Amino acid sequence: MDRYPRSDSIVQGRTGLQTYMAQVYGWMTVGLLLTAFIAWFAANTPAVMMFVFSSKITFFGLIIAQLALVFVLSGMVQRLSAGMATTLFMLYSALTGLTLSSIFIAYTYSSIASTFVVTGGMFGAMSLYGYTTKRDLSGFGSMLFKGLIGIVLASLVNLWLKSEALMWAVTYIGVVLFVGLTAYDTQKLKNIGEQIDTRDSATLRKYSILGALTLYLDFINLFLMLLRIMGNRR
């Protein structure tokens, strides 16, 4: 079942779509900035690092909390208030910052910054393509989803195998996958923006937050894959 509402009777103009997409990108940017700040702050605060990484229970508890927030936002957005949806997205972004704070310990600041710039360029190019192309990308959805499941399973298996070859295979395949997902998701969000009633501020905010989460996940995962390739370890 499609989690987005269908409003075929509502004719949305170009202004409504542009407003929706602007809010999607705006909230995604806010989420990324919050994640970056929390990650940097945690990495420079020993007490926070001890709290996050001294216990596997704490670390994996944070991971589970992140997954729960994604499922709640994705599956229950219509039942949430606009304020609650925004709060949950901000909470998710902050928790992601905590779990990713170790990259500031593992990699040099300059390589993190350069990887972020490259990620931004790749993401921007593919998102622009997804928004402007006349080609229907919906046919790639099944393949991209299967690829996503594949790299998740391979990553879990590699926790035990500890295979460097498998790790690099997952990394390079992951780059291709999230580049594709960026274009696919952007086109999907564009279609959603043409269907929802953007004149309703609550509806606009809730689906902008959900769209922001979608593109945020694409960006973060693409960044992490590229950081493995481009990052200079300390």
Task: For each feature predicted by the language model, list its residue ranges.
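A hydrophobic alpha-helical transmembrane-helix feature that marks the membrane cores
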Residues: 1-234
